[in-house]
Amino acid sequence: VLTSPYEGADAFDAGEPYRIERTREPVLLPHPFMVRQVDALAKEIGADFVVIDPAVPLGLIGPSLSLPYDLVLHGAEVTVPGRLPGAKQTLAYTLRRARKIIAAGGYPAAEGEHAAGRPLPTTVVPCGVDPDKFHPLSTSERVAAREHFGIPADAEVILGLSRLVPRKGFDTAIRAAARLRLTRPDLLLVIAGAGRDRDRLERLATELDAPVRFLGRVPNEDLPSLYGCADIFTMLCRNRWGGLEQEGFGIVFVEAASCGVPQVAGDSGGAAEAVADGETGVVISDPENVQSVVDAFTLLLDDDALRARMGERSRRRALDEFAYDVLARRLGDALGVYD
């Protein structure tokens, strides 16, 4: 693996069973030295092909490499240049020359083919989850988790977890929680994560007297218990800038699903692939419509049996479709390493 450096990388690298080379540059950019560096390392280890992630901008070195290359597509990094004159032509050339395309979902797969102007040899390998780490909590574990996070044991908890940026839709969730508070005094919207939108969201919650608690950034080791102590998980992601900004997939939906928690999602990008509408949760076509969000939350909070069924289906889907061992096999088949 050739990648960029970060603080503490040496400790991580030492614990991995494969070779990791790190550049001096904080960001990998497509320039002639990078081409030479990749070619030299590939020759040294006897590689048959190169996998480049992300496709933009780093993937632009692909056509200059001496070996075949595969590209990994996530979403926005293809959507924006795919709609800009000049950039689209360069991107299309890079995509068409690739041996294979690995897309994180149907949305980036479609964006790649739109940019290329033709079908591509694409395999969808979505974001995955460790189902042993992210698992449903027992009753006692759920009680302990709520106590750990300072959440009342009898609260109806709607959890949101993500970077706090406008397209994640937490403002709509806050507005919905404020309405629901009138009829559901035990409701609590818990928002975890950090980002530039936090100040605005806190002001909105105060103005509306909404039942919201901001946890800030939560350590990775605490995430399974945070998901597991919620009744519903939500991220009302929405499109912005005429569709140039969308949700690529939504790993948080899959993590919540693996914990057996039903999800309420906004229909943006790949979110509707991560959440099976009517099966593992609810996908809202207009995630800025507050009443639609209120209705979705009410549907799940009013029906314990429905919530339990969706939670069970969520867990099963996480095991069958999103577990790392399942996706590793799919990726290996796509790359031809099992041939």
Label each region the model flagged.
Residues 99, 228-246, 261:
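Acidic donor-binding loop of glycosyltransferase active sites
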Residues 1-29, 108:
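N-terminal strand-loop element at the rim of the active site
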